[in-house]
């Protein structure tokens, strides 16, 4: 909604433009009227809409054509004033003033116009019949108000309607010739209806209607008012109410009725509560609210975010089988301008029988939040998060983690989402490794309507010390790393080489020395294609010797043809190293972390006992 309103008064000389302004401000009819009033600003706190309002007078005798066009350009609404006792001033509306205001606007939005019949005290009856043909000819005319500056009649109402024409315009919502909602308005209201239909039965129950009413207007409807609304709909729209529930047709009819009765601010309140601008598009401020993410921090959904997206899943899982079929997924996407996720989704997250499971769905939300939080905020906005959850913005569904440097200092991360970069030469098996993380063999992945190129990210859940973590695998080709300084930041690095091609290990060793050797990121070398015979090693350190010398864990083995448990163990090891980065460089043998912790504790206790015994011996020897 606009932050201020600029009203311009036009009309023939002596119709009372200046008197109207001075009567509004002084609350009495002025005895002496200047040729033109100075621009007046009415503060927000004394206007019905709580918006500062600038009122500008025009005098044809004092101002030039260029000055008039400049004022028209700056105005938000124009009041064309005529004298109800002078029919010639009515005719000038059609022949002179409206062409001056909007005559140069062939297409696009036109300035809203209010017709103002002044001096109603000089004529009995009304001139509305005379101006109706003009109102029919020019759809930009919002309304006509008859008033009297001398008797202070309808002065406040005149400027209220002018404000209303700017803040709650009719033109974007309603086609007066067709007497129906414009397509963009009907589309926006249809989306709002779908968001408010929590059980997806294509109708709003009393409970859903009251939740909608409270979200938009701050209070529920009284039971009798609710019944009256449904009675009006039943009377006017076949199928507007079914099984005592308001259908989409009934919902659209109600909004049409509001507009036809001059209550279009009601429809605008609904639209703006769900993020729409005056052009009936979701505003950038609504879709992408401010969220500051300092360097070294990451973004995750918090409990409010996960609860909301899980409710959305359950709403669209109409057969309650725990997965979203393609049809159910299409239903979920219906409130978006374009589908947020493409066919690569089924090769990015865990699935069940080719359908999106709840776990995979939550994984996808987690991935988007981590990789591109602005897209996550927009997606939550399309789903109506701020309105349905009664929150200020989607940013309240996001947690910004503490800096990675602090995690490294404390020796443990509080993050629930961990990033693993999988680095290696082309052909070493990185894509197979990523798909194995989802429980797919590479052959299965390529047979299941896969996109031409498999995604470079996959995500799944892993348990670390009894806690569930989300682990993201990101595939990076070693060739690009050796040529350019790409972002190698991650929680754990997985350096993959082909056990049958020793040259690929040399590349991994080079990457390690260049990017990770002097840092604190834990690294794990993985020997892929472990089912193939080992190649002839070139002169130099073997992978095991290299890892031992650099105080790294022993290389792990992986084969897409190997047992599933060995793959799970590798992913668990990566997640554990990311969670406890300070332990990674002391891991010279495949001893489990929990066992090493026990051994350290036992060793400490034994040392304490020996120290105490030695002390007693020394005391006795004295």
UniProtKB/Swiss-Prot annotation:
Record InterPro entries: EF-hand-dom_pair, EF_Hand_1_Ca_BS, EF_hand_assoc_1, EF_hand_assoc_2, EF_hand_dom, Miro, Miro-EF-hand_domain, MIRO_dom
Binding residue positions for Mg(2+) 1: 18, 57
Annotated residues for binding of Ca(2+) 2: 317, 319, 321, 328
Cellular component GO terms held in the UniProt record: mitochondrial outer membrane
Regions crossing the membrane: 597-619
Residue positions binding Mg(2+) 2: 431, 475
Pfam families (alphabetical): EF_assoc_1, EF_assoc_2, Ras
Binding site for GTP 1: 16-19, 59, 118-119, 121, 149-150
EC number from the UniProt entry: 3.6.5.-
Family per record: Belongs to the mitochondrial Rho GTPase family.
Complexes and interactors: Homodimer. Interacts with the kinesin-binding proteins TRAK1/OIP106 and TRAK2/GRIF1, forming a link between mitochondria and the trafficking apparatus of the microtubules. Interacts with ARMCX3. Found in a complex with KIF5B, OGT, RHOT1 and TRAK1.
Protein function: Atypical mitochondrial nucleoside-triphosphatase (NTPase) involved in mitochondrial trafficking. Probably involved in control of anterograde transport of mitochondria and their subcellular distribution. Can hydrolyze GTP, ATP and UTP.
Protein name (Swiss-Prot/TrEMBL): Mitochondrial Rho GTPase 2
Organism ancestry: Eukaryota, Metazoa, Chordata, Craniata, Vertebrata
């Amino acid at each position: 909604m606009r932050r201020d309103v600029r009203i311009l008064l036009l009309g023939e000389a002596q119709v009372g433009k200046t008197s109207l302004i001075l009567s509004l401000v002084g609350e009495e009819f002025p005895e002496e009227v200047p040729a033109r009033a100075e621009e007046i600003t009415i503060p927000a706190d004394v206007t019905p809409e709580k918006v500062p309002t600038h009122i500008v007078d025009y005098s044809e005798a004092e101002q030039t054509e260029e000055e008039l066009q400049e004022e028209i350009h700056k105005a938000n609404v124009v009041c064309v004033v005529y004298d109800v006792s002078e029919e010639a001033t009515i005719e000038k509306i059609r022949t002179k003033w409206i062409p001056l205001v909007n005559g140069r606007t062939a297409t696009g939005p036109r300035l809203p116009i209010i017709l103002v019949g002044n001096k109603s005290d000089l004529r009995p009856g009304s001139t509305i019949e005379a101006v109706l043909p003009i109102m029919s000819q020019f759809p930009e005319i919002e309304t006509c108000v008859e008033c009297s500056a001398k008797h202070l009649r309808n002065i406040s109402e005149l400027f209220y309607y002018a404000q209303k024409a700017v803040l709650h315009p009719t033109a974007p919502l309603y086609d007066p010739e067709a007497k129906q909602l414009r397509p963009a308005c009907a589309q926006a209201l249809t989306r709002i209806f779908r968001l408010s239909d929590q059980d997806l039965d294509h109708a709003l129950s009393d409970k859903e209607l009251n939740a909608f009413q409270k979200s938009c207007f701050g209070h529920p409807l009284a039971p009798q008012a609710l019944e009256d609304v449904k009675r009006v709909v039943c009377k006017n729209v076949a199928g507007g109410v079914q099984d005592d529930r308001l259908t989409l047709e009934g919902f659209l009819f109600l909004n049409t009725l509001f507009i036809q009765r001059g209550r279009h601010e009601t429809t605008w309140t609904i639209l703006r509560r769900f993020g729409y601008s005056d052009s009936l598009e979701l505003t950038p401020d609504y879709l992408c609210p401010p969220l500051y993410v300092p360097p070294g921090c990451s973004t995750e959904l918090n409990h409010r975010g996960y609860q909301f997206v899980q409710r959305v899943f359950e709403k669209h899982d109409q057969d309650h089988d725990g997965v979203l079929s393609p049809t159910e997924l299409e239903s979920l996407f219906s409130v978006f301008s374009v589908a947020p996720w493409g066919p690569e989704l089924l090769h990015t997250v865990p699935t069940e029988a080719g359908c999106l499971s709840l776990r995979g769905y939550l994984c996808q939300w987690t991935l988007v939040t981590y990789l591109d939080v602005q897209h996550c905020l927009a997606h939550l906005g399309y789903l109506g998060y701020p309105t349905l959850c009664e929150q200020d913005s989607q940013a309240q569904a996001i947690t910004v983690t503490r800096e990675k440097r602090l995690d490294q200092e404390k020796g443990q991360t509080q993050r629930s989402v961990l990033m693993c970069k999988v680095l290696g030469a082309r052909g070493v098996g990185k894509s197979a490794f990523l798909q194995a993380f989802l429980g797919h063999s590479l052959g299965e992945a390529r047979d299941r309507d896969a996109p031409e190129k498999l995604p470079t990210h996959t995500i799944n859940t892993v348990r670390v010390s009894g806690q569930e973590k989300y682990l993201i695998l990101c595939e990076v080709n070693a060739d690009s790393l050796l040529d350019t300084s790409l972002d190698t930041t991650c929680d754990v690095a997985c350096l993959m080489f082909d056990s049958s091609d020793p040259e690929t290990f040399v590349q991994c060793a080079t990457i390690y020395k260049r990017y990770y050797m002097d840092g604190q990121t834990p690294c794990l070398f993985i020997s892929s294609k472990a089912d193939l015979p080992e190649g002839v090693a070139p002169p130099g350190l073997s992978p095991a010797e290299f890892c031992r010398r650099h105080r790294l864990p022993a290389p792990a083995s992986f084969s897409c043809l190997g047992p599933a448990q060995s793959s799970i163990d590798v992913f668990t090891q990566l997640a554990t190293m990311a969670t406890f980065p300070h332990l990674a460089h002391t891991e010279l043998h495949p001893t489990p972390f929990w066992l090493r912790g026990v051994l350290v504790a036992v060793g400490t206790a034994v040392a304490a006992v020996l120290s105490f015994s030695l002390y007693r011996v020394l005391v006795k020897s004295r």
